[in-house]
Amino acid sequence: MRLILLSSLLLLGIFLANGHEEDPDGKVLNSLIDTLMHLQKLYANLKYSFLTVHRARSFGSGSERLYVTNKEIKNFEALRQICEQAEGHIPSPQLENQNKAFANVLERHGKEAYLVVGDSANFTNWAAGEPNKAAGTCVKADTHGSWHSASCDDNLLVVCEFYFIL
């Protein structure tokens, strides 16, 4: 909304800078009002479209988090850099439905992927016999969403997590 107001002020400033100091018939002002109303409608439509997609994605996955792959296969450090550049995060499912949404991506691609498990995690989905520090200091999820210890040098499917917080 602020962007719309700033755009209107910019249009007015351009008009005044071009030497049009007067607007006796109110044509310029009316034009600015029309433009502002049009921009407000565009903003409302964009917001509605975004929220519709957000609700659909959340409904379909049961999660307010979106797990996306670029289909690359990389080690943990490369994954960290890729997710950071995309302004996302390494997956860190905090709830069962989030883990299921993450596992759906892995199952669809038939690949395993890294995830991060916090020290104070309320939800975990370790496979039997895990965690096993001898296998490595990283954690990967299999195509069923079960978690396993892994080497951080393993090349796994790149999956980043994005939050929908409104």
UniProtKB/Swiss-Prot annotation:
Purpose of the protein: This phospholipase A2 inhibitor binds directly phospholipase A2 in the presence or absence of calcium.
UniProt tissue specificity: Expressed by the liver.
Subunit structure: Homotrimer; non-covalently linked.
Gene3D superfamilies linked to this entry: Mannose-Binding Protein A, subunit A
Signal peptide: 1-19
Domain C-type lectin stretches: 46-161
Carbohydrate attachment residues: 122
Entry keyword set: Calcium, Disulfide bond, Glycoprotein, Lectin, Phospholipase A2 inhibitor, Secreted, Signal
CC annotations in GO: extracellular region
Listed name of the protein: Phospholipase A2 inhibitor clone 10
Disulfide bridge partners, by residue number: 83-160, 138-152
Family of this protein: Belongs to the alpha-type phospholipase A2 inhibitor family.
InterPro entries xref list: C-type_lectin-like, C-type_lectin-like/link_sf, C-type_lectin_CS, CTDL_fold
Gene Ontology molecular function: carbohydrate binding; phospholipase A2 inhibitor activity
